[in-house]
Curated annotation (Swiss-Prot):
Any single Gene Ontology cellular-component annotation: extracellular region
InterPro entries assigned to the protein according to its UniProt record, in alphabetical order: SCRL
Species for this entry: Arabidopsis thaliana (Mouse-ear cress)
Signal peptide limits: 1-22
Protein's gene: SCRL11
Protein name: Putative defensin-like protein 244
Compartment annotation: Secreted
Main location: secreted
C-alpha cells in the first residue's frame, strides 16, 4: 500500500513540474526557405517540421508549421519555435 501511495505522489509531483515548465516557454514565429516541394518528406507540415529541426536544433521544438510553395522548386516554412533566451 505504501508503494502505491508513493507512486501516486511521484506522479502528481511530476505532473506539476512538467506543467510549470511548459508555461515558461515562449514561442516565436520562424520563417525559412528551403529547396524542394512541400511534400518532399510527407505532408507539408511534417516536411517543414523536419526542415526546421535540421536547420536549428531539437530544442527549438517547431510546431504549427505551414508550408508555402515558391517558384523554382523552393518552399517557405512558417513555424513557431521556442524563442532564444538571449
Amino acid at each position: 500500500m505504501k508503494g502505491i501511495a508513493m507512486l501516486l505522489v511521484s506522479c502528481l509531483l511530476f505532473s506539476f513540474l512538467s506543467t510549470n515548465l511548459a508555461k515558461e516557454l515562449k514561442w516565436c514565429p520562424s520563417k525559412d526557405v528551403f529547396n524542394g516541394s512541400c511534400t518532399d518528406t510527407g505532408s507539408p507540415s511534417y516536411t517543414c517540421f523536419l526542415d526546421l529541426l535540421g536547420s536549428k536544433s531539437a530544442s527549438a521544438m517547431p510546431k504549427n508549421c505551414k508550408c508555402t510553395p515558391l517558384p523554382h522548386n523552393r518552399r517557405q516554412c512558417d513555424c513557431f519555435v521556442v524563442c532564444d533566451s538571449n
